[in-house]
A protein has these predicted regions:
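Anionic-ligand binding region
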Residues: 186
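Short hydrophobic segments within beta-strands
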Residues: 31-32, 56, 94, 145, ...
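A contiguous active-site-proximal alpha/beta segment in oxidoreductase catalytic domains
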Residues: 98, 121-182
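Acidic-histidine catalytic/liganding microenvironments
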Residues: 47-48, 70, 85-86, 137, ...
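Beta-loop-alpha module in the N-terminal Rossmann-like domain of NAD(P)-dependent dehydrogenases
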Residues: 70-115, 119-133
Length: 187
């Protein structure tokens, strides 16, 4: 178990060095202030030091509460205000799924990068509209929130699978404990 702990510690150290060396070239906005956002996404953005300029929501009475909870961030109910700000390079969207497409297409039409929780749209026609909007805007980065797909384990697996010349199968299990601080084998 000591060996596993040393690997985890080494990984955390290297990850920390990499993250501190990387900087962001602009500000970002976040649309949505629901439970998933506040419990899962905002802590990750804080940990990664992603500079947020705006938090957008649909409720005027939440604006002062948001600004108190997130100092230095402007709370707004205006998506147009966010999208017209040239300093904002990308927008994170985590709202009701039925609104993902409408907000996502506006973000892409503004030329900004988009992170949107799944599902990004409801049907193939909307998906094609998103793809077309992305092309027209110069191909800004688009990421759909499929957490497991972005995990370090999956990135390593993709590299290994790319070297294979024959079809293969694999069985992948995710640990759901307090990794990396917990017991990586038993949690």
């Amino acid at each position: 178990m000591e060996y596993v702990k040393s690997i985890i510690d080494r990984y955390k150290h290297l990850r920390s060095l990499r993250q501190l060396g990387e900087g962001y070239r602009g500000m970002y906005a976040f649309v949505g202030i629901g439970n998933h956002s506040t419990s899962n996404l905002y802590p990750v953005l804080s940990y990664l030091h992603v500079p947020l300029k705006y938090i957008g929501c649909k409720s005027h009475d939440k604006l002062p509460l948001i600004e108190r909870a997130y100092p230095g961030v402007k709370a707004t109910t205006s998506l147009a205000e966010i999208l017209s700000d040239d300093e904002v390079k990308g927008v994170f969207v985590s709202i009701a799924p039925e609104a993902h497409f409408d907000i996502g297409i506006k973000v892409l039409e503004s030329g900004k990068a988009l992170f949107v929780e799944k599902p990004p749209c409801r049907n193939a026609q909307q998906l094609m509209q998103l793809a077309d909007a992305r092309k027209k805007a110069g191909n800004p980065t688009v990421v759909v929130g499929l957490q497991k797909r972005m995990s370090p384990a999956m990135q390593l697996l993709k590299k290994e699978l790319a070297r294979c010349s024959e079809p293969m199968t694999y069985n992948l299990r995710y640990l759901t404990g307090a990794y990396p601080e917990g017991d990586a084998l038993l949690d």
